Amino acid sequence: MKPTMAILERISKNSQENIDEVFTRLYRYLLRPDIYYVAYQNLYSNKGASTKGILDDTADGFSEEKIKKIIQSLKDGTYYPQPVRRMYIAKKNSKKMRPLGIPTFTDKLIQEAVRIILESIYEPVFEDVSHGFRPQRSCHTALKTIKREFGGARWFVEGDIKGCFDNIDHVTLIGLINLKIKDMKMSQLIYKFLKAGYLENWQYHKTYSGTPQGGILSPLLANIYLHELDKFVLQLKMKFDRESPERITPEYRELHNEIKRISHRLKKLEGEEKAKVLLEYQEKRKRLPTLPCTSQTNKVLKYVRYADDFIISVKGSKEDCQWIKEQLKLFIHNKLKMELSEEKTLITHSSQPARFLGYDIRVRRSGTIKRSGKVKKRTLNGSVELLIPLQDKIRQFIFDKKIAIQKKDSSWFPVHRKYLIRSTDLEIITIYNSELRGICNYYGLASNFNQLNYFAYLMEYSCLKTIASKHKGTLSKTISMFKDGSGSWGIPYEIKQGKQRRYFANFSECKSPYQFTDEISQAPVLYGYARNTLENRLKAKCCELCGTSDENTSYEIHHVNKVKNLKGKEKWEMAMIAKQRKTLVVCFHCHRHVIHKHK
């Protein structure tokens, strides 16, 4: 039998070559065992693999028998998803809480298999303007597109859809899926997931709209839904754009022609007269903008979306932006059955920062000349600048994490973090390094990146003060205690290979080592099949703990969330530490009576 992933690769190529193709009989791929090994491989390394839904069902205990039960329930129509367990997490920069729906692991497994199938069909047809929850795309690819394509914009329209994920209309979504997939069983299964409901305080609630945030399928279903918005905005762009290289302002053309005339004169002159004309030439070159000044009749619309956040740049008037906003409002209400937030959908002049994906975005308006070595360089007037919102995002991070306090003169004073004192020295420095590197990596595209240097200083001294407070010592004694003689400091620790030292992250090395280019990979997503090691290990029918290799014995996967949390006291813990794996294939007896003997 041909591997399912090889079939999906062919389906993906067909979808790419013919975007109007309609696909049928997809449900049968959910009745093949191999897709569940791939799904498990994708899921088990995630933190949520050990998070329980409403049942005691996690990545632990996965087996061939479990796959057979899943396939049988899908085949005879007896499978119904369990309600998700609702929990709440704090929203960033808000006192409001965001609801998350945690499915059971069996439901996650089936959702992941469905996601793999749907992605092979939809990924090739999604528009390039969409960057959220897609292979080879990220926040950075969205921001790089903005930097590359939004140059010369006069206005920004910052889009916000009210409660997007919570208000996706189920009937509309299934209708959109049915346009591309003619498979009643697959549509019914997706509809079952949407209507599964949720448990909160052990009370069942029905779901009438929305996709549960936390579900495996939710991001892809949201992209399928908002793909209609992408298509609409691109159609709007075709109507709106009125770009012509001839529409250069008379003032720009006159200055440009004058510079050309002086340039021709320079070739014929010598001595003092040439020096005098050269000075005049340089003065006029300074006044010439890097980008041609175009008249207001030159109209261009650009658009980028990441999940439910989108931004539009407009070369045109404010009235044009208001017209675009009204068109969006009507489409989102009539077609998507959702509402564009009037208060949060802002029209911002490009000289002022527009907020998108945690960055401030604005268009440079400066003819300033900068010197780089012996060469004079003009700044790119009209180019896009990405900035870190230091007084907003970074300031809020410092407050939230209690890294520093602000004094009366507005300067910052680093302080210790009380809630970290019970952690080990190694854990404390690891937390600080992780936070610092995370922020530096995310804001690596910003032109004011070096201003994070002060933030790095606050992080370092907050870390030192936290360790000093833990040991009830002074800051200077703590620095002396952990210095290595070269001026750097770090926490010593020991592993099997010998003594090691974890240094505090050096700011100059915190930025991602990968070159930030303006190119987005256009390589197709391959779904080629290669039997994964986990499938091989299960099918080998050999217990990796006791060595049993009985064909008639049931074998399961024992799963842990983090290998580093294992103490190494039990035989199975030593086996997992030695293999440095989160999974161990064991026989039924070992799993129930050796590993889970105390449960």
Curated annotation (Swiss-Prot):
Biotechnology: Mobile group II introns can be retargeted and used for highly specific chromosomal gene disruption in bacteria. Could be useful for genetic engineering and functional genomics in a wide variety of bacteria.
Listed InterPro entries: AI2M-like_HNH, DNA/RNA_pol_sf, Domain_X, GrpII_Intron_Splice-Mob/Def, RT_dom
GO BP: any one term: mRNA processing
Top-level lineage group: Bacteria
Region (Intron maturase type-2): 381-549
Assembly, per entry: Homodimer.
Family: In the N-terminal section; belongs to the bacterial reverse transcriptase family.
Protein's UniProt name: Group II intron-encoded protein LtrA
Species of the source: Lactococcus lactis subsp. cremoris (Streptococcus cremoris)
Lineage of the organism: Bacteria, Bacillati, Bacillota, Bacilli, Lactobacillales
Gene: ltrA
